[in-house]
Every structure is written in structure tokens, then in C-alpha cells.
Amino acid sequence: MSSDSSRTIPVDTHVQAFPRQISSEAGDEEVVLHLDTGQYHGLEGVGAFVWRLVREGATVGELESAIRREYEVEPDRCRDDLQTLLAELHERKLVEFHNEPPR
């Protein structure tokens, strides 16, 4: 997926785990079960790192900053890869985007 501006998720967008899922750490991996579809999703590496932050609640900008602190990655590459990951998680109904922090 390209990261053209029509698909860019703003940095102040709050990312929240979809309520109808459960997840668990399995070593360095996160395993997510979507309760409506019964599908399991495995996240490794940076994906698992992002998922742990999403479970706690974070904005796109906070996620990007945390990735850059934890991993050695160029800013543009970080931004593009994060946008792609979040779009994929949203498409699979594993995350939701909100303008305000979740309550």
C-alpha cells in the first residue's frame, strides 16, 4: 500500500484496540483473536511493539515517537511503515481511530 496523502492518518489521531478482540503475549509475539470472525492474527517485532502501545492507548504521533526511540529507523520510513501497519490493522478491524482519547 502506498502512503499517499489521501490515506494518511493524522498524528493526533487516537488509536484504540477494537473492543471485540482479545490478545496475549506469546514470547516476542502478540496473538490477537478477533471475536466476531474467529480469526487469529500474529504480530511480531515492531508490529508487536506497536500493539502493546495501542492496548494502552496512544496517538499516531506517540506511536511514531516510541518506535523511533526503540528502533534505529529513518523518520520517513518509520512514518510510512506505521501508516501501512495501522491501515492493515484497521482493515482487519483490530484497531479503531478516534479524534478524542478513549474513555
Model regions and ranges:
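Short alpha-helical segments that sit at the start of domains
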Residues: 24-47
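Long, charge-rich, low-complexity alpha-helical segments
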Residues: 3, 7, 39-103
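Hydrophobic packing positions characteristic
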Residues: 1-21
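Short, functional N-terminal and low-complexity linear motifs
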Residues: 15-19, 29-35, 52-54
